Design a protein with these regions (language model features):
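Predominantly five- to eight-bladed beta-propeller fold
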Residues: 36, 98-100, 145-159, 170-226, ...
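Short coil/turn segments that connect the beta-strands within blades of beta-propeller domains
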Residues: 74, 120-122, 164-166, 243-245, ...
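Serine-hydrolase catalytic core recognition
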Residues: 236-237, 244, 250, 376-377, ...
Length: 699
């Protein structure tokens, strides 16, 4: 009995020890897990008020100054709220003295001659059910000017009064050949309605365009013969050519690889080409920096922007189409036209020869004498925008940097003398000063082969360069826009600052193909296929960043982007899983051939002419490469990158047995902001995903 009791005692002791060991083991496992969960909760608690301030309360939203110059350049008007008025009223300011005068009129006055009111102010054009009508403001009589039948999918728009007020030019758009697609209309969830909308997909029919002229008293339309019967084309501009008998039309080929400026003589019924250019890639891209032309010398000559020598430059041509001179020689790009001041003999333009992330004002003599010179004062980095008065004496000058909100000044030319400050954005400026402990770093990444890419990096305020940090890459990477710009940009920049404070390095890189002012070869490097080049250069840029900055942890890399950036996120996750571990793709287009013709065909033509380019550009074809954690976010009400384009990828990933996360916001469009709380919810959802799969903080 005694031996048996001892054995039972030993068994109980062993059992107790086993339980204690098991408890210790469970506690050891639970402790780190609990710590991780608490850390995530703490991070969410920290960032949510900041994001709420960004997306719901507008705490970091800077005010923009919007003034309209008076025709005589003596001053400007600003719509302001005044006591006793429910709506904003125009307030006039004298440019020289600053004297303020409140007008009795409401809203902004539209300039005469462009669309609405006639040059003499006595007639008004309006658009109704696809047709143009004219109302006599004196007697109230209405005249119908165009006769398209309702339901024909034909619209007559973009009306332009002739200088003498006797004719109206307009553009007719015929969408009847464009295929219809069905879209669910929000309503009864059991019996939703469907509406039909036309969508010009890659390779399909596009709108048929015509330019017409009709007498202001009514009558038959005179159509300009600017195309062959079955020719597809777009119009860059259509306007009166400085008189009431000639029209200027900028005609762009379907693939935007050719453009012609046509001068139509209405009385003679003749059309002649005064400028023409072509390029195997494109001549006018979606960002349209070199579109249109400007008449000078009373219409005897014109200024046009072209990239025909490899740089975006200004040229002077005679009205007959003879080139007179290259106005802006040199290895630099014009970013955009600003002002032609013929009285003083200057052409003003934006450029930044030494830094593709910034923008300054330059000028060059119209007669070709001298070299381009910088007008923006030295020592003021960032982005500078200018809006001139008609006579060129007064200017609204707005400048900002990535970390400082815009300030608008009234400046007097030619000396760039500051007269007064019109908008300081003092509230936001003070808020940013209290938040920003470290300035955003702009840097250059040399990946070899002569390719040097601009990038920015946002680090947490308690950044310790002796440790390693996870990286979140923000990507766009397509030809429509740059992300690396030294200018105030909300709300993305504010979001990235908030995310960085959690313990991430937020990085963005502009690869070749983005519209940086670095020459035509840089921008056209992606011609034929959007996706492959950007994916490789983004990855190589990240490696170069880590090579030069040892605190970059390449074992913890996330990437996110919206629209084209969403597509590049998918390509990164599918094609470079060795580099990227977590991705968030918002509103992507993983099947390029299903996107709209107006954008995609500029850069890739169609599948019929470029099948391999479309195969390489479509992320769906590389989905088997997914190894990391992927979140796809989309709006079911998309009118840009339709939901079906993404659902095809969802089906493919399911077929491949790939695990991923997918979030759709009902009835939201491309911006995914409709509905109360949507923007905040989306951003918090992204943050949760990062915290779960790419834990922040140094190691």
């Amino acid at each position: 009995m005694r031996d048996r009791a001892e054995n039972v005692s030993i068994m109980k002791t062993n059992l107790t020890l086993a339980c204690v060991v098991a408890a210790w083991s469970t506690a050891a496992v639970a402790a780190p897990e609990n710590s991780i969960q608490e850390s995530r909760k703490s991070a969410l608690k920290k960032i949510e008020p900041r994001l709420r301030g960004i997306y719901e309360q507008g705490e970091y939203r800077a005010r923009g100054f919007r003034g309209d110059w008076l025709p005589d350049s003596s001053g400007y008007t600003v719509v302001e709220r005044v006591p006793g008025q429910r709506h904003g009223v125009p307030v006039r300011y004298d440019a020289a003295s600053g004297k303020r005068t409140v007008s009795e009129r409401r809203g902004r006055e539209r300039p005469r001659g462009f669309g609405g009111r006639s040059p003499d102010g006595r007639k008004m054009l309006f658009h109704e059910r696809g047709n143009l009508h004219l109302r006599d403001l004196d007697g109230g009589r209405t005249t119908q000017l165009t006769r398209s039948r309702p339901g024909e999918s034909v619209s007559n728009g973009q009306p332009m009064w002739s200088p003498d007020g006797k004719r109206v030019a307009f553009v007719q758009s015929d969408h009847s050949k464009i295929r219809l697609r069905s879209v669910l209309v929000p309503g009864d969830p059991s019996y939703p309605r469907v509406r039909q909308t036309r969508f010009a997909r890659v390779g399909g029919d596009i709108a048929k365009l015509k330019v017409g002229v009709v007498d202001a008293a009514g009558g038959e339309t005179q159509w300009l013969q600017i195309s062959e019967p079955d020719e597809d084309f777009y119009l860059g501009m259509a306007e009166w050519a400085g008189n009431s008998n000639e029209l200027l039309v900028e005609k762009l080929s379907r693939f935007r690889d050719k453009r012609d400026f046509l001068l139509a003589d209405l009385e003679a019924g003749s059309i002649k080409t005064i400028f023409s250019e072509s390029d195997p890639a494109w001549v006018v891209a979606s960002y349209r920096k070199n579109a249109g032309l400007e008449w000078i010398r009373d219409g005897r000559a014109f200024l046009v922007i072209s990239e025909k020598d490899g740089w975006r430059h200004a040229y002077i041509y005679s009205r007959e189409g003879k080139e007179e001179r290259l106005l802006t020689p040199g290895a630099f790009d014009i970013i955009e036209k600003v002002k032609i001041d013929e009285k003083r003999g200057w052409f003003y333009f934006n450029a930044s020869p030494d830094n593709g992330t910034q923008k300054y004002l330059y000028r060059v003599a119209l007669d070709g004498s001298g070299k381009p010179e910088r007008v923006t004062p030295e020592g003021r980095p960032g982005t500078h925008n200018y809006s001139f008065s008609p006579d060129g004496r007064w200017v609204f000058h707005t400048y900002s940097t990535f970390d400082s909100p815009p300030v608008t000044e009234l400046v007097e030319f030619p000396g760039h003398r500051v007269v007064r400050t019109l908008e300081k954005n003092e509230r936001v400026s003070q808020k940013m000063k209290s938040l920003l402990k470290r300035p955003t770093e702009f840097l250059k990444l040399d990946i070899g082969g002569g390719v040097v890419m601009d990038a920015f990096m946002i680090a947490p305020s308690d950044f310790d360069p002796s440790k390693k940090y996870p990286v979140l890459v923000y990507v766009y990477g397509e030809p429509h826009a740059q992300t690396v710009l030294d200018r105030w940009a909300t709300p993305h920049a504010d979001y990235h600052r908030a995310v960085a404070e959690l313990g991430y390095l937020v990085v963005s890189i502009d690869n070749r193909g983005t519209p940086a002012p670095k020459g035509a070869a840089w921008r056209r490097a992606v011609a034929g296929s959007l996706g492959p080049l950007s994916t490789e250069e983004q990855a190589e840029g990240l490696k170069e960043l880590a090579r030069t900055r040892p605190y970059v942890d390449l074992s913890r890399v996330g990437i996110w982007g919206w629209s084209g950036g969403g597509s590049n996120t998918l390509n990164a996750m599918f094609r470079r899983p060795d580099v990227y571990h977590v991705g968030v793709a918002v509103a992507p287009k993983p099947q390029a051939h299903l996107y709209n013709a107006g954008f995609q065909e500029i850069y890739m033509e169609t599948r019929e002419t470029n099948a391999e380019g479309y195969r390489k550009a479509s992320a769906i074809n590389f989905a088997e490469g997914l190894k990391g954690e992927l979140l796809i976010i989309h709006g079911s009400g998309e009118t840009n990158t339709h939901l079906e384009i993404v659902e095809g990828l969802v089906d493919r990933l399911v077929e491949l047995g790939k695990q991923f996360d997918y979030m759709t916001y009902p009835n939201r469009d491309h911006g995914i902001h409709e509905g109360r709380g949507t923007s905040l919810h989306l951003r918090m959802h992204m943050v949760r995903y990062l915290l779960n799969h790419l834990p922040p903080g140094p190691r």
